Amino acid sequence: LQVEHPVTEEVTGLDLVREQILIAQGMPLSVSQEDLSINGHAMEVRIYGEDPANDFLPTAGPVLLFERSKVADARYDTGIETGSNVGIEFDPMLAKIIVHAPTRTEASLRLARVLETTRIQGLITNRDFLVSVLREQAFLDGDTTTDYIERINPPRSRAVDRGQIIEGAIAAAMAAQYDRRLASNTLKRIRSGWRNSIMPPEHVEYTCGEEEVTIDYQSQRDGSFNVMADDLTLKVELVERDGNTIDMTVDGRRVAYTVTSNEDRWLTHGPSG
């Protein structure tokens, strides 16, 4: 089979692996050339354990979280799951992700959104780089050659603004607070954050890339938190902590983050990736 046979399968509706097995059993192909037709466009990307910002150097380590996107239909060909470990003995490809759409542009933009909402935490991957490529105008225009990366030089990582960093840090702080409360052996039936008296603010510091963020938060009698970051004071309410997901409102705006931790590292994945 060709390496990218899923693309052919998506546009023809033919199961090439099945056909290969039938041939190996001495049976003929189940279709003729005249039976085949091309329907729309399919596109595939490969998620690798590699660091695009460091000359695509392979990366290894535990997969703390792997969750497929739910925003659109997509095919995942992968052998990893949450808890897998990516070693150095083999090629660091983690998954192939394939989408189908009526046009090439629709397929590209759909795949970018699927990638953006695919949650992979624990090791550096090329996911954000692939999203950049798929949304690059030159790529959408079909200006793709073997020197595309050197010639167009798409961003190697996703740009994250200060507000997104702060919100991700708040999600990590709220998740940590909830997990500590859950692990407590006293008054477990009382909801997280509730106090019969106002407690002093809690203080936590995070580093995201080259940026540092300081979060101070104080529980209120109604179970909400006053959160201070930079010159902002925000009201945060914890809606739910379900597995790795934390659902909260920030000044009345509801957002959900996936939050995992590994020793002193906190990994967050929010609405924008």
Which sequence ranges carry the predicted segments?
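A structural detector for short beta-strand units
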Residues: 213-215, 232-237, 254-257
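Short Pro/Gly-enriched beta-strand edge/turn motifs at strand-loop
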Residues: 27-28, 241, 251
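Catalytic cores of soluble metabolic enzymes centered on carboxylation/carboxyl-transfer
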Residues: 2-232
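Structured, non-catalytic alpha/beta "coupling" segments that mediate domain-domain communication
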Residues: 44, 54, 250-273
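Well-ordered beta-strand segments characteristic of repetitive beta-sheet solenoids
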Residues: 225-227, 248, 268
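Generic beta-strand structural signal
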Residues: 219-220, 240-241, 260-262
